[in-house]
Regions:
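Acetyl-CoA-dependent GNAT
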Residues: 3, 10-81, 89-94, 98-102, ...
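Conserved active-site alpha-helix within GNAT-family acetyltransferase domains
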Residues: 85, 89, 114-144
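C-terminal "cap" of GNAT-fold acetyltransferases
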Residues: 45, 105, 112-116, 135-157
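Conserved SAM-binding loop
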Residues: 8, 111
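Generic domain-boundary/flexible-linker signal
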Residues: 69, 118-122, 157
């Protein structure tokens, strides 16, 4: 599968079971179905579909902030069998484009210290670390908070 083979589209309620299955496959402390159900209206809750199956998703929101809205990538995963094919990068870029379109100026996210692949992707896309949060995850692992300025990101595209 190459990046052009995957279709990125807004999530639909019918996708939630597939999203939860990917969540459970990818994370040791997965979000429950109802958490995703509450997020259906987020501006950048997108899925990647390949050959009729959902293989990844991203959930990102927007919060007003005195004319410089802040986006937050809340959750992001690609099924292990669909990794290393550009699906994650395409999902992330699609979410950033959508957030920019609704007026978001800066996007932030948290990433596990041990998640080298994700940290590399985020660095490639212009995210910069701004702080470390000790014991952020339930298992005690630290997180890095990363941010990207969407005006700079879009200028670099």
């Amino acid at each position: 599968m190459t990046p052009v083979d995957a279709t990125i589209r807004p999530v639909e309620r019918a996708d939630l079971l597939a999203v939860v299955r990917i969540e459970r496959t990818c994370f040791s402390d997965p979000w429950p179905y109802d958490a995703f159900e509450r997020l259906l209206e987020e501006p950048a809750f997108l899925v990647a579909e390949w050959e009729g199956a959902v293989v990844g998703y991203v959930v990102a929101d927007s919060t007003p902030n005195h004319g410089r809205d802040i986006g937050h990538v809340k959750d992001f995963a690609v099924h292990p069998e669909a990794r290393k094919r550009g699906v994650g990068r395409t999902l992330l870029r699609s979410a950033l484009v959508r957030l920019h379109a609704v007026g978001v100026a800066v996007v932030r996210l948290e990433v596990r210290e041990s998640n080298a692949a994700a940290r590399s992707l985020y660095a490639d896309e212009g995210f910069d670390p701004i702080r470390r949060i000790s014991n952020y995850y339930r298992d005690g692992e630290d997180a890095f908070v990363l941010v990207v300025d969407l005006a700079e990101w879009t200028a670099g595209e």
